[in-house]
């Protein structure tokens, strides 16, 4: 897609470079001239946009207007641009953190809605960039199909979530049972309808560009929808698996900015000239310490550590359970060098605090590469930010570019090292079986438990 350029600078049908003559060809032959002309026409018809385009050929996107509130502009008018940006970023950061705490207080369902809203906004910002770059081509149905595919993919992923975590609710609603039973077929049929609409929308002079934008939409869906689905999966494991990773990325973003602002001297990467080694290293140590402390505080409360479950009897999400071993204090022997520093041989920790070190390390060492990736994308399209939704910060995608990598890592980490069989899910699957199947499973399980010595055999009189 980066090789396309604005329609106004594209060569006309007869401006394509002619193929070189073979040795021995008669330069003035009528037959050869006609053959060459036909070949050129055929090449031009099929390949109107040659692969010789460079990134500099991409039309520039007009800069977004400044959306900083007038009250802030007046209050900070006497400051230099550097300190003005500092105060704007700081005030908006504190505001967003306060709103985040409020949503946490409102419960897991509101957090899910927040994730869904952020996903839609990030998708909108990325798709809008493609539309603004190539809007002069007047591509048919591009925006309509993009949003249609977003709807289809969300229907597929969140339908899977409903089937997994809302089984008791679905069993009471006959209409929902049909949708869940044939969910994957319905999802596939919806996607096929969009696929056929795309094929029908193809226009001869825009074939290549339309396929570029088709790929653009699907990659955007992969980045936004898939990752947001994983975030919600992490949330169902317990709110702590949602809060510690996300807050670690936020902490790293803030502390790396602070260390870089005050102490930054050595550039870190060319993609982001303002990033420095001082900020990167300072952010790493700050994030590990923050994650360790946050894990200790949150591990004390059932509200944060219990898996999120939907209870049909109260028609709401509940976070009540007996905390697992991860969230129960354990005594550990310290290694020799720590014994000398702390002057004690043992320490009591929650096992989750040890896992938090791995999460914080990823957030501070690998997570920033999501931001570097986004910086490269923005440089390719000559834009400063994805949007101007948040003054001083850019778009929503500018704030969540690192979170998507983190979501995938946490999901892989949980499935690889933490998650075991879920009794609740097993029970839900048993409840939808036929009575004969349930009875057979009961007899098999009873026999197994008797052989293990857990149950006593029933005496026949």
UniProtKB/Swiss-Prot annotation:
Please give the cofactor(s) recorded in the UniProt entry for this protein. Mg(2+)
Give the top-rank taxon of the lineage listed in the UniProt record for this protein: Eukaryota
Q: Give the metabolic or biological pathway.
A: Phospholipid metabolism; CDP-diacylglycerol biosynthesis; CDP-diacylglycerol from sn-glycerol 3-phosphate: step 3/3
Residues carrying Phosphoserine: 35, 37
Q: Where is the protein found, in the record's own terms?
A: Endoplasmic reticulum membrane
Biological process GO annotation list? Answer: CDP-diacylglycerol biosynthetic process; lipid droplet formation; phosphatidylinositol biosynthetic process; phototransduction; positive regulation of fat cell differentiation; signal transduction
- Name the membrane topology term: Multi-pass membrane protein
> Might you give the EC number(s) for this enzyme?
2.7.7.41
* Entries under InterPro entries matching the protein: PC_trans, PC_Trfase_euk
Primary location: endoplasmic reticulum
> Region annotation Disordered: residue ranges?
1-67
Omega-N-methylarginine PTM positions read 7
Q: Gene Ontology cellular component? A: endoplasmic reticulum; endoplasmic reticulum membrane; membrane
Q: Where does the chain cross the membrane? A: 96-116, 149-169, 183-203, 230-250, 279-299, 357-377
- Annotated GO MF terms: diacylglycerol cholinephosphotransferase activity; phosphatidate cytidylyltransferase activity
Question: Keyword set for this entry?
Answer: Endoplasmic reticulum, Lipid biosynthesis, Lipid metabolism, Magnesium, Membrane, Methylation, Nucleotidyltransferase, Phospholipid biosynthesis, Phospholipid metabolism, Phosphoprotein, Transferase, Transmembrane, Transmembrane helix
The chemistry this enzyme catalyses reads: a 1,2-diacyl-sn-glycero-3-phosphate + CTP + H(+) = a CDP-1,2-diacyl-sn-glycerol + diphosphate; 1-octadecanoyl-2-(5Z,8Z,11Z,14Z-eicosatetraenoyl)-sn-glycero-3-phosphate + CTP + H(+) = 1-octadecanoyl-2-(5Z,8Z,11Z,14Z-eicosatetraenoyl)-sn-glycero-3-cytidine-5'-diphosphate + diphosphate; 1-octadecanoyl-2-(9Z,12Z-octadecadienoyl)-sn-glycero-3-phosphate + CTP + H(+) = 1-octadecanoyl-2-(9Z,12Z-octadecadienoyl)-sn-glycero-3-cytidine-5'-diphosphate + diphosphate; 1-hexadecanoyl-2-(5Z,8Z,11Z,14Z-eicosatetraenoyl)-sn-glycero-3-phosphate + CTP + H(+) = 1-hexadecanoyl-2-(5Z,8Z,11Z,14Z-eicosatetraenoyl)-sn-glycero-3-cytidine-5'-diphosphate + diphosphate
Task: Report the activity regulation comment.
Answer: Inhibited by its anionic phospholipid end products, with phosphatidylinositol-(4,5)- bisphosphate showing the strongest inhibition.
Q: Where is the composition biased (Basic and acidic residues)?
A: 20-56
- Let me know which tissues express this protein, per UniProt: Expressed in adult tissues such as placenta, brain, small intestine, ovary, testis and prostate. Highly expressed in fetal kidney, lung and brain. Lower level in fetal liver.
- Say which enzyme class the record assigns: transferase
Physiological role: Catalyzes the conversion of phosphatidic acid (PA) to CDP-diacylglycerol (CDP-DAG), an essential intermediate in the synthesis of phosphatidylglycerol, cardiolipin and phosphatidylinositol. Exhibits almost no acyl chain preference for PA, showing no discrimination for the sn-1/sn-2 acyl chain composition of PAs. Plays an important role in regulating the growth of lipid droplets which are storage organelles at the center of lipid and energy homeostasis. Positively regulates the differentiation and development of adipocytes.
- Name the protein family: Belongs to the CDS family.
Q: How the protein assembles, per its UniProt entry?
A: Homodimer. Interacts with FOS; this interaction may enhance catalytic activity.
Protein name as it appears in the record? Phosphatidate cytidylyltransferase 1
């Amino acid at each position: 897609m980066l090789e396309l350029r604005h329609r106004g600078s594209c060569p006309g049908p007869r401006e394509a470079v002619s193929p070189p003559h073979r040795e021995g060809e008669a330069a003035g032959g009528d037959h050869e001239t006609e053959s060459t002309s036909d070949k050129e026409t055929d090449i031009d018809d099929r390949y109107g946009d040659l692969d010789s385009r460079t990134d500099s050929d991409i039309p520039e996107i007009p800069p977004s207007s400044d959306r900083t509130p007038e009250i802030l502009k007046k209050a900070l008018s006497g400051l230099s641009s550097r300190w003005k940006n500092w105060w704007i970023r700081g005030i908006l950061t504190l505001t967003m953190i306060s709103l985040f705490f409020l949503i946490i207080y409102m419960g897991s369902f509101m957090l899910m809605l927040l994730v869904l809203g952020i996903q839609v906004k990030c998708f909108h910002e990325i798709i809008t960039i493609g539309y603004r770059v190539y809007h002069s081509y007047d591509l048919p149905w591009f925006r309509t199909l993009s949003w249609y595919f977003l709807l289809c993919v969300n229907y597929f992923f969140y339908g899977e979530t409903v089937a997994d975590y809302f089984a008791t609710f679905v069993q009471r609603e006959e209409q929902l049972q049909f949708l869940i039973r044939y969910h994957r077929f319905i999802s596939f049929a919806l996607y096929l309808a969009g696929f056929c609409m795309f094929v029908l929308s193809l226009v001869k002079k825009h074939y290549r560009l339309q396929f570029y934008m088709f790929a653009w939409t699907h990659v955007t869906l992969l980045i936004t929808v898939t990752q947001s689905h994983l975030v919600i999966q992490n949330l169902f494991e317990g709110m702590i698996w949602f809060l510690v990773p996300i807050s670690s990325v936020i902490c790293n973003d803030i502390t790396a900015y602070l260390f870089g602002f005050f102490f930054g001297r050595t550039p870190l990467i060319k993609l982001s000239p303002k990033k420095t080694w001082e900020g990167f290293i300072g952010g790493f140590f700050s994030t590990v310490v923050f994650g360790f402390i946050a894990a200790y505080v949150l591990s004390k409360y059932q509200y944060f550590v219990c898996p999120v479950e939907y209870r049909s009897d109260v028609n709401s999400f509940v976070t009540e359970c007996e905390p697992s071993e991860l969230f129960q204090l354990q005594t550990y022997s310290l290694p020799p060098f720590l014994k000398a520093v702390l002057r004690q041989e043992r320490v009591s920790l929650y096992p989750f605090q040890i896992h938090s070190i791995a999460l914080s390390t990823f957030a501070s060492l690998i997570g920033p590469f999501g931001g570097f990736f986004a910086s490269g994308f923005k440089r390719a399209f000559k834009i400063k930010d994805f949007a101007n939704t948040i003054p001083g910060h850019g778009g929503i995608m500018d704030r969540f570019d690192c979170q998507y990598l983190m979501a995938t890592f946490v999901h892989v980490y949980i499935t690889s090292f933490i998650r075991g069989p879920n009794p609740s899910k097993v029970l839900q699957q048993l409840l939808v079986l036929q009575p004969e199947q349930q009875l057979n499973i009961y007899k098999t399980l009873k026999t197994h438990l008797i052989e293990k010595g857990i149950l006593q055999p029933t005496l026949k009189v």
